[in-house]
């Protein structure tokens, strides 16, 4: 609901993993597409979709090169974490460039891991994180446990390109 606002257009997760975002999206009645590079994740995601008895499509592909459906309302992505290396940042930048080159109007929701703690996490994130080609509209800190939090970033295509 945060991502797409209406029932119009696809919700796409280009790093769908086990399919949690796909299931949540499909439960709202939206057209839903998931992409993952790992065939084991694609198979597991499909099994979870089947178990949840929802209508979502999942296929193998590269987040930096996949083709978006024509009618995309939002891209929602919760990239795999635990590595936080420069190559991970490059992967996200390349994924964003791919999306932006195909669709300049869809919303973007990115969920990222952050160090837990601090009362102004939302403000810190909006000043510390850049999403090339996108303007961050809001960010919400989500505590997970003592040392780990997550942040949900909602962004729209930047008009300054």
Name each region found by the language model.
Residues 1-161:
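Class I S-adenosyl-L-methionine-dependent methyltransferase catalytic core
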């Amino acid at each position: 609901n945060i991502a797409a606002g209406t029932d119009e257009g696809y919700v796409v997760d280009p790093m769908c993993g086990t399919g949690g975002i796909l299931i949540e999206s499909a439960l709202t009645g939206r057209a839903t597409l998931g992409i993952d590079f790992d065939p084991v994740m694609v198979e597991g995601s499909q099994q979870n979709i089947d178990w949840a008895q929802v209508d979502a499509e999942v296929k193998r592909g590269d987040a930096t090169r996949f083709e978006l459906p024509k009618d995309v309302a939002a891209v929602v992505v919760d990239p795999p974490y635990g590595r936080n290396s420069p190559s991970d940042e490059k992967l996200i930048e390349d994924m964003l460039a791919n999306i932006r080159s195909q669709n300049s109007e869809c919303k973007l929701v990115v969920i990222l891991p952050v160090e837990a703690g601090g009362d102004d996490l939302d403000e810190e994130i909006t000043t510390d994180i850049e999403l090339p080609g996108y303007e961050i509209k809001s960010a919400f800190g989500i505590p997970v446990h003592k040392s780990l939090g997550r942040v949900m970033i909602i962004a729209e295509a930047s008009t300054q390109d």
